[in-house]
Each structure stands twice: as C-alpha cells, then as structure tokens.
Amino acid sequence: MPKRILQGTVVSDKNDKTVVVRVERRFAHPILQKTVRRSKKYKAHDESNQFKVGDLVSIEECAPISKDKRWTVVSAQS
C-alpha cells in the first residue's frame, strides 16, 4: 500500500524535532450543497528543526515515531 502524502501549513514548531501541520480538506455538503472547509492537525517529525510557523509543507505517512507522531515532513512547498 502506498504511503499517503498530504499538504498543509505549519501551525506550531515549539516542540523539539516536531511540527504541527494543519491540513485542510474541502467537500460538498450532502444536504446544503455548498463547499465546506474542514481542517485537521497532524504532528510530524522534523529532524533538523528547519520548518517554521507559516511554512507550506508536504508530510508523508510513516511508521510510528512516538505516541502521536505517524507523519514525517518531506519537503517545503513554494
């Protein structure tokens, strides 16, 4: 099974080697028939502490690193 890759924005970099990335998804509401925005936050591994708040990044699924971390930052988006 291929690893999932998501794009999002770094919202916190206060932890060592960890960033919190907010990933937004859009979908059509089944009853209201309008586009709805929902977001979810993922903790991702950042080995070199190079990503800062506001950066657009890609995260990739990986084996569990800690209790909450199952994603790693792959690259920055431009």
Curated annotation (Swiss-Prot):
Q: What Pfam families does the entry give? A: Ribosomal_S17 (PF00366)
Xref: NCBIfam families = PRK05610.1, uS17_bact
Q: Which organism is it from?
A: Sinorhizobium medicae (strain WSM419) (Ensifer medicae)
Q: Is the Oxidoreductase keyword given for this protein?
A: no
Gene Ontology terms describing biological process: translation
Q: Does the keyword Transmembrane apply?
A: no
| Name of the protein in question | Small ribosomal subunit protein uS17
Coiled-coil regions listed: none
This chain's function reads: One of the primary rRNA binding proteins, it binds specifically to the 5'-end of 16S ribosomal RNA.
Quaternary structure and partners: Part of the 30S ribosomal subunit.
Query: Which family, according to the similarity comment?
Result: Belongs to the universal ribosomal protein uS17 family.
Gene Ontology molecular function: rRNA binding; structural constituent of ribosome
The organism's superkingdom is given as Bacteria
Alphabetical UniProt keywords: Ribonucleoprotein, Ribosomal protein, RNA-binding, rRNA-binding
State a GO cellular component annotated for this protein: cytosolic small ribosomal subunit
InterPro entries reported in the protein's UniProt record: NA-bd_OB-fold, Ribosomal_uS17, Ribosomal_uS17_bact/chlr
